[in-house]
Amino acid sequence: MICANQHHIDSQIGRPIHELDTPALLLDLKASGRNIAQLARFFADKHAQLRPHFKNHKCITLARRQLDAGSAVGITCAKLGEAEILADNGFDDILIANQIVGDIKLRR
């Protein structure tokens, strides 16, 4: 969850699926690790820069794993609020892929 604390996440482990609040990200960590590594290997010798999109999973831990794999140069997000969450969690190379509209958001 994008704004869940670790205690809340830990309390959900082992619960039956029908008892989980949605949306909920359920993930096979081994498969996820293999996919992240495969994508990093693919981009390792390419003349292109990988910038995974945060909106796909909205998970700080996965975003960090994607960057730690070595081939990503930063993270992409769709909204200013997502960028703020990423920045608050130590990400410093963030691309907002959509327009930021309105003075209030521009000042943020």
Task: Kindly give the residue locations of the regions a language model identified.
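Short, acidic/polar
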Residues: 4-14, 79-83
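N-terminal glycine-rich anion-binding loops that anchor highly charged ligand groups
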Residues: 7-12, 31-62
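Generic N-terminal amphipathic, Lys/Arg-enriched alpha-helix
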Residues: 8-27
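A generic short-segment signal for beta-strand/edge and adjacent turn/coil regions
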Residues: 18-22, 43-45, 64, 89-92
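Active-site mouth loops of central-metabolism enzymes
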Residues: 21-29, 49-53, 69-75
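Active-site-proximal beta-alpha core segment in soluble small-molecule metabolic enzymes
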Residues: 53-108
